């Protein structure tokens, strides 16, 4: 049985890392084989691209350059880790996926929808996560949290306006996609974690039930 792909999205300072750890533990405790990924990154080549993307270069990095690097890393990760893991029955938990590009490069950077769609179609061929949790945080609060972690990278230095546009695109995309669940990350972290645990428990329960019904049907046809 094919595994499921669950992705956690959010602005800087939204609390993705702790939520991802929570999801991985919940799935493991439920008996799933779990693989964890991050974007950009997740394979040796994709990690090298990650460093390239985040480096503060002493030259102009165009919106299109940034976008193409993101998709190059994504295709490497899909080909070498995500697709094989899902086909082997593992559940994959991702720190970011295509929604990040749609929000950051499409919303924040202002890359045209035509360009975003064309590149996404070529790179992904319709593939998307089974479930996405978007941790919604006010950009000013998120940036303050990120600063508390240390020096900001090139993207984190983009400014408040950039992150406000990025957040607006995230929310717009979530409104039109039932597989994206918005989690209020402005709540105390304990409440955020409780909300996430509830979402994951319900999702796992539904798909374990589906798997059981499918198995019964297969047995009945034999």
Curated annotation (Swiss-Prot):
GO cellular component, one term: cytosol
GO biological process, one term: dTTP biosynthetic process
Catalytic reaction list: dTMP + ATP = dTDP + ADP
Residues annotated to bind ATP: 10-17
Lineage: Bacteria, Pseudomonadati, Pseudomonadota, Gammaproteobacteria, Alteromonadales
EC number of the protein: 2.7.4.9
Stored InterPro entries: P-loop_NTPase, Thymidylate_kin-like_dom, Thymidylate_kin_CS, Thymidylate_kinase
Record function comment: Phosphorylation of dTMP to form dTDP in both de novo and salvage pathways of dTTP synthesis.
Ranges in coiled-coil conformation: none
Family statement drawn from the similarity comment of this UniProt entry: Belongs to the thymidylate kinase family.
Record bears the keyword Kinase: yes
GO molecular function (one): dTMP kinase activity
Name under which the protein is recorded: Thymidylate kinase
Keywords in alphabetical order: ATP-binding, Kinase, Nucleotide biosynthesis, Nucleotide-binding, Transferase
Superkingdom as given in the UniProt entry: Bacteria
């Amino acid at each position: 049985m094919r595994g499921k792909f669950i992705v956690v999205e959010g602005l800087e300072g939204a609390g993705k890392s702790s939520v991802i750890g929570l999801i991985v533990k919940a799935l493991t405790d439920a008996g799933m084989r779990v693989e964890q990924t991050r974007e950009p990154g997740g394979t040796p080549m994709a990690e090298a691209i990650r460093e390239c993307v985040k480096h503060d270069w002493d030259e102009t990095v165009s919106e299109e350059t940034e976008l193409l690097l993101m998709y190059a890393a994504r295709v490497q990760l899909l080909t070498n880790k995500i697709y094989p893991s899902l086909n082997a029955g593992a559940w994959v938990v991702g720190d970011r996926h295509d929604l990040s590009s749609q929000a950051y490069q499409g919303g924040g950077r202002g890359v045209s929808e035509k360009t975003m769609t064309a590149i996404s179609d070529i790179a992904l061929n319709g593939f998307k996560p089974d479930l996405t949790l978007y941790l919604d945080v006010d950009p000013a609060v998120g940036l303050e949290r990120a600063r508390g972690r240390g020096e900001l990278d090139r993207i984190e230095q983009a400014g408040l306006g950039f992150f406000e546009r990025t957040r607006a695109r995230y929310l717009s995309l979530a409104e039109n996609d039932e597989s994206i669940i918005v989690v209020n990350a402005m709540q105390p972290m304990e409440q955020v974690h409780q909300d996430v645990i509830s979402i994951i428990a319900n999702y796992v329960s539904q798909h374990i039930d589906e798997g059981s019904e499918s198995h019964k049907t297969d047995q009945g046809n034999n």
